[in-house]
Amino acid sequence: MAKKVVKTVKLQIPAGKANPAPPVGPALGQAQVNIPSFCSQFNETTKDQMGFVIPVIISVYEDRTFTFVTKTPPASDLLKKAAKIESGSANASQTKVATITHKQVEEIANLKLSDLNAYCVEKACKIIEGTARNMGILVKD
């Protein structure tokens, strides 16, 4: 018989930098999870993605054990890295802060395809282009 999930915790944690301080400690403490164990496992899993914020979904079982699934970094983080900017535009419709190529959008879409609500790369590209547009990033061919 499978273990019963009693709580699901969703967090966004910098890759390789999980520690018991907020937001990780309080969120997992409420679920009565072994926090140092989670931090070491998460840091080991994400050490090759340093510099990105990694979404993680933690399933806590009734015997206080846990499993977690890491997702791909948010599209906005990937777009900022591709455009070499610190943040998006405060007024995206009027001010464009950077330009990226369609090829860069396609690379990001391929990376994010498993987490997006799309079945093909073309549709995933449209989703990424929409995110870029909302950040004030212009997509050129």
Curated annotation (Swiss-Prot):
Q: Which UniProt keywords apply?
A: Methylation, Ribonucleoprotein, Ribosomal protein, RNA-binding, rRNA-binding
User: Has the keyword Translocase been applied to this entry?
Assistant: no
* Annotated Gene Ontology cellular component terms: cytosolic large ribosomal subunit
- Biological process (GO), any one: translation
Recorded hits in Pfam families, A to Z, give: Ribosomal_L11, Ribosomal_L11_N
State whether keyword Membrane applies. Answer: no
Indicate the secretion signal residues: none
SMART domains xref list:
RL11 (SM00649)
What does the PTM comment of the record read?
Answer: One or more lysine residues are methylated.
The protein's GO terms of the molecular function aspect are: large ribosomal subunit rRNA binding; structural constituent of ribosome
Quote the subunit structure annotation: Part of the ribosomal stalk of the 50S ribosomal subunit. Interacts with L10 and the large rRNA to form the base of the stalk. L10 forms an elongated spine to which L12 dimers bind in a sequential fashion forming a multimeric L10(L12)X complex.
Give the UniProt family note. Answer: Belongs to the universal ribosomal protein uL11 family.
Q: What does this protein do?
A: Forms part of the ribosomal stalk which helps the ribosome interact with GTP-bound translation factors.
Q: What is this protein called?
A: Large ribosomal subunit protein uL11
